[in-house]
């Protein structure tokens, strides 16, 4: 199963991203030390990696794509990205006048950003 790189939290509960080139390289080195036959990773573009700022997912995915294209070993390692997406961007609480297609859990990018992001992934891969 692929490793999910979601980011980390420190002892002060600060969010620490782990999607940068150096983080992916460190993961690859750890996998190589274990002699894994099929190392794989999926990068979570939200949560701790975005410091829960859902619009940052667009920039993070771009950086992950750049990392994959820069290093052939990392291109083989990084199998995908996880993005929080829904029809309407943001989030809402349950009750009252709810908006169809808007998340009731984590904030998400909306449909337009999702389409642009998928197009970018298709172009860069």
What are these regions (language model features)?
Residues 1-12:
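Single conserved hydrophobic/aromatic residue that forms the stacking wall/gate
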Residues 10, 40-42, 78-82:
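Structural preference for beta-strand elements that scaffold enzyme active sites
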Residues 111-124:
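PLP-dependent enzyme catalytic core of the Aspartate aminotransferase-like
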Residues 64-91:
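Substrate-binding cleft of secreted/luminal carbohydrate-active enzymes
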Residues 43, 110:
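Conserved, mostly hydrophobic/aromatic
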């Amino acid at each position: 199963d692929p490793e999910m790189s979601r980011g980390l939290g420190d002892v002060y509960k600060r969010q620490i991203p782990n999607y940068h080139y150096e983080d992916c390289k460190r993961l690859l080195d750890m996998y190589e030390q274990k002699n894994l036959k099929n190392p794989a990773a999926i990068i979570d573009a939200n949560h701790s990696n975005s410091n829960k700022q859902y619009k940052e997912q667009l920039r993070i995915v771009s950086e992950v794509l750049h990392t994959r294209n820069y290093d052939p070993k990392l291109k083989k390692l990084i199998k995908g990205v996880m993005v929080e997406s829904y029809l309407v961007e943001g989030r809402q609480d349950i009750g009252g006048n709810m908006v169809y297609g808007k998340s009731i859990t984590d904030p998400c990018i909306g449909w337009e950003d999702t389409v642009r992001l998928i197009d970018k992934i298709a172009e860069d891969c």
